[in-house]
Amino acid sequence: MVDPQFASNFYFDQRLNIDAVKLLPGEYFVTTREMVLSTVLGSCVSACIYDQQSRIGGMNHFMLPSSENSSGFPIECARFGGYAMGILIRELLKNGARKQNLVAKVFGGGNVQPAMVTSAIGSQNARFVKKYLAEYEIPILAGDLEGFYPRKLHFFPKSGRVLLKKLHVSHNDTIAKREKHYSRLLLSTVKPGI
């Protein structure tokens, strides 16, 4: 059975001349192939984790640090960092990565919407990913977290290479609209007691 949270938006990136997959919020992807994993981040965070020896890597894209239902059980949804990090690491290991060879690069966590500055969702996501990786003893080799700008991210899992572009000037509100849309979607799909 295919996991619906496994990214499936494949395309050929002509600028980079390589097969690619675009990750949306709540998705993850693991591969052994030579390709690029791409996403755009606002307050969300992506962890790019790879095995430096076997060259197996993957990325997630989560919206909120973690969540539990009213019974205290974690919600199994990759929109939440706790689940997104766990499933990414499990899939890497299942595909042949070794825990002791895993390293990470982390990005995002920007407080890009004026309303998010007070709730600091981006900062909460950034703190969460750093704490999670420290607890699992996966070193962070590089990253770009927090701030006020969205980011466009390209991760090459076989080499660990990252291309990052901060989107400093945005004359449209596409990212803010997406953040609001995914926040509403998240609230509508997480029901108390589930």
UniProtKB/Swiss-Prot annotation:
It is an enzyme of class 3 (hydrolase). It catalyses: L-glutaminyl-[protein] + H2O = L-glutamyl-[protein] + NH4(+). InterPro entries: CheD-like_sf, Chemorcpt_Glu_NH3ase_CheD, Cytotoxic_necrot_fac-like_cat. Belongs to the CheD family. CDD domains: CheD. Its EC number is 3.5.1.44. It comes from Nitrosomonas eutropha (strain DSM 101675 / C91 / Nm57). Probably deamidates glutamine residues to glutamate on methyl-accepting chemotaxis receptors (MCPs), playing an important role in chemotaxis. PANTHER family: CHEMORECEPTOR GLUTAMINE DEAMIDASE CHED-RELATED. This is Probable chemoreceptor glutamine deamidase CheD. One of its GO terms (molecular function) is protein-glutamine glutaminase activity. GO terms for biological process: chemotaxis. Keywords: Chemotaxis, Hydrolase. The keyword Acyltransferase does not apply.
